[in-house]
Design a protein with these regions (language model features):
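Non-catalytic, topology-defining segments of multipass membrane proteins
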Residues: 1-87, 91-148
């Protein structure tokens, strides 16, 4: 059996004070440790979604389209995709929003996920319904044990 070493995972350190923006979101959230996800979603809404919408309109063509697409691809797929995937994993395990604001979770799943290649509800169905139902053991087809 493998001996576990000292835990090196990052831990939450509460800031001395929250910004007004963070205080606004904390009213809707279950756990203040999920605030980095709000910051990530804000950046995605500013940098990724407007450009993606612009790329799918007939406003740009030819070289102008490509000049916008190349940085869009880098930002969305190289910079944000991994961060978004980690956030999606975490919010599937622990719902970030209070029950009466769960529509915000649905908004992320149904509106934001397609910008990163996820069809609505499929990540949750696979991850929680298939992967974790097998308890992530060796006989699980999507086991992560060999990578630990």
């Amino acid at each position: 059996m493998k001996a576990l070493t000292t835990l090196t995972d990052p831990v939450y350190v509460e800031p001395k004070k929250f910004s007004r923006y963070e205080k606004f979101w904390l009213k809707y959230m279950n756990d203040k440790r999920d605030l980095p996800f709000i910051h990530l979603l804000t950046a995605i809404h500013i940098l990724v979604i407007p450009v993606a919408v612009l790329l799918y309109t007939p406003l740009l063509d030819g070289w102008y389209w490509w000049l916008l697409y190349v940085p869009y691809f880098y930002v969305s797929q190289m910079y944000f995709k991994g961060r978004f995937g980690l956030m999606l994993h975490c919010i599937c395990h622990r719902k970030p929003f209070k029950k009466q604001y769960n529509w915000l979770f649905s908004y992320v799943i149904w509106f934001v996920c397609p910008f990163f290649g996820h069809t609505p509800e499929t990540y949750f169905a696979h991850h929680m319904g298939m992967h974790h139902v097998e308890n992530n053991m060796d006989d699980d087809a999507s086991s992560t044990l060999p990578y630990q």
